[in-house]
């Protein structure tokens, strides 16, 4: 067994998470008597008798490690006692779906003190309130409490603070969570390699997407962290491209497109990988793509080298822009001085998004405190506005894009158009976009890259040939 598999052979650390959330609530509110959370409900597709695809509620999973629908959990913070509630057996459901998990089986699977049926929720809450002499508060999430659930007997029912406490606690991952993220990355790396192999003969983006999803499922990620992006040629200039069904042969030139941008990651036990690579469709990168790729790889390499506990994410993002400016100046796409281009925010036309985001149970994980109202366009879409704590996991995903919709207004504005050489720029529209994205675990003195998907030009071309 690998180190990751050894760690994951243990139970998901639900009680440790419950304690951390309780301590967060205590720091803000003087203590939590009880925490109550519900799993996602079984829901039907509109106008159908088919179940909707199931996605577990993240707050519930964080305190249970349980993927069952229609369940609940209660944490008695005074006794440090975690109780999981699972649905009772429905004889009619057994006919179609088989026997559900029993309380005894659930107790062996999950890091909880006891397992009861959901029919016992109210009596359990009442018993806890009584044992606390009505002196403690109950915490829940307002929109995630079923009708009929009663918090009678508690001094207060707070439905506003728990969500924030969980989201802030989730920023710092424990060793088990890092192992889950590493596992998701390992499987997703296999998917990206499968995508490179598929690209050799693929005639349409969807064939590459199929290879990604198939490799993820075959290796243990039944779900994708997000809708995969498979963008050939100029499609790579669209940040969240969703078509994935365009032919890879240019309809005008009848030539195979130069490259394809792939942004895809599998979800393993609710934990996400988020990886982006650009691969050549003709075995080797076209000269213009190669030049942009080298700049983006340098942006990522230098930004990752800067990472450690306490680093300001704004500063890392700014470094990425400066490296982009230097590279585009060298190619002749930009003209002027580095400082002037930086101050005028000209590079935002080519690198319009943030450098990355927290990663965990959500692709854009909680706790980043972005400011989408920021008047500074360089930082408006930065999803993390903080000094990075040790234990956090971030994506580092610089990119350079040639999107006419974004660049044209900059070209037409007299105060910024003078900084771009349109004749040189014309050679790069076919590149579309280059983004390189890895998942980085922040440590006290540096960082650890969880992503092993090939990314050097030599590695990628050797697989693509």
UniProtKB/Swiss-Prot annotation:
UniProt binding sites for Mn(2+) 2: 263, 274, 437
BP GO terms, sorted: proteolysis
Listed InterPro entries: Aminopep_P_N, Creatin/AminoP/Spt16_N, Creatinase/aminopeptidase-like, Pept_M24, X-Pro_dipept-like
CC cofactor: Mn(2+)
Enzyme class: hydrolase
Domain of life assignment: Eukaryota
Catalyses which reaction(s): Release of any N-terminal amino acid, including proline, that is linked to proline, even from a dipeptide or tripeptide
Any one GO MF annotation of this record: metalloaminopeptidase activity
Record's cofactor remark: Binds 2 manganese ions per subunit.
Keywords: Aminopeptidase, Hydrolase, Manganese, Metal-binding, Metalloprotease, Protease
EC number: 3.4.11.9
Any Pfam family hit: AMP_N
Keyword Nucleotide-binding applies: no
SUPFAM superfamilies reported for this sequence: Creatinase/aminopeptidase, Creatinase/prolidase N-terminal domain
UniProt keyword annotation of Protease present: yes
Amino acids binding Mn(2+) 1: 274, 397, 437
Role: Catalyzes the removal of a penultimate prolyl residue from the N-termini of peptides.
Family: Belongs to the peptidase M24B family.
Name of the protein in its database record: Probable Xaa-Pro aminopeptidase pepP
């Amino acid at each position: 067994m690998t180190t990751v598999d050894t760690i994951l052979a243990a139970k998901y650390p639900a009680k440790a998470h419950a304690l951390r959330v309780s301590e967060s609530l205590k720091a803000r509110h003087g203590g939590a008597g009880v925490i109550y959370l519900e799993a996602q409900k079984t829901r039907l597709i509109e106008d159908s008798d088919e179940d909707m695809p199931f996605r577990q509620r993240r707050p519930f999973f964080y305190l249970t490690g349980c993927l069952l629908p229609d369940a609940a959990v209660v944490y008695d913070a005074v006794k440090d006692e975690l109780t999981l509630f699972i649905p009772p057996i429905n004889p009619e459901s057994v006919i179609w779906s088989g026997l559900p998990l029993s309380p005894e089986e659930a107790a062996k699977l999950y890091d909880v003190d006891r397992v009861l049926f959901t029919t016992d929720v109210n009596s359990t809450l009442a018993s806890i309130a009584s044992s606390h002499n009505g002196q403690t508060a109950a915490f829940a999430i307002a929109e995630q409490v079923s009708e009929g659930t009663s918090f009678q007997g508690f001094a207060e029912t707070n439905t506003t603070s728990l969500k924030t406490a969980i989201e802030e606690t989730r920023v710092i991952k424990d060793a088990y969570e890092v192992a889950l993220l590493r596992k998701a990355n390992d499987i997703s790396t296999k998917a990206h390699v499968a995508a490179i192999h598929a690209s050799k003969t693929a005639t349409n983006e969807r064939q590459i997407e199929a290879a990604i999803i198939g490799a993820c499922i075959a290796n243990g990620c039944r779900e994708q962290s997000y809708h995969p992006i498979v963008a050939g040629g100029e499609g790579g200039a669209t940040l969240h491209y969703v078509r994935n069904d365009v032919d890879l042969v240019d309809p005008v030139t009848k030539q195979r497109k130069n490259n394809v941008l792939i942004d895809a990651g599998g979800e393993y036990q609710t934990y996400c990988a988020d990886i982006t690579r650009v691969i050549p469709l003709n075995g080797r990168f076209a000269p213009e793509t190669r030049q942009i790729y080298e700049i983006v790889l340098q942006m990522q390499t230098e930004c990752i080298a800067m990472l450690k506990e306490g680093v300001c994410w704004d500063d890392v993002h700014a470094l990425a822009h400066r490296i982009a400016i230097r590279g585009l100046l060298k190619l002749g796409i930009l003209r002027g001085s580095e400082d002037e281009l930086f101050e005028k925010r000209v590079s935002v036309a080519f690198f319009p998004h943030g450098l990355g985001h927290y990663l965990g149970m959500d692709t854009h994980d909680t706790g980043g405190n972005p400011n989408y109202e920021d008047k500074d366009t360089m930082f408006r879409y930065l999803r993390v506005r903080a000094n990075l704590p040790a234990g956090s996991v971030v994506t580092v995903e610089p990119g350079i894009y040639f999107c006419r919709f974004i660049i044209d207004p900059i070209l037409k504005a007299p105060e910024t158009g003078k900084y771009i050489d349109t004749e040189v720029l014309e050679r790069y529209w076919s590149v579309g976009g280059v983004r390189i994205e890895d998942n980085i675990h922040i440590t006290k003195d540096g960082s650890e890259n969880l992503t092993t998907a090939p990314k050097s030009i030599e590695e990628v071309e050797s697989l693509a040939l």
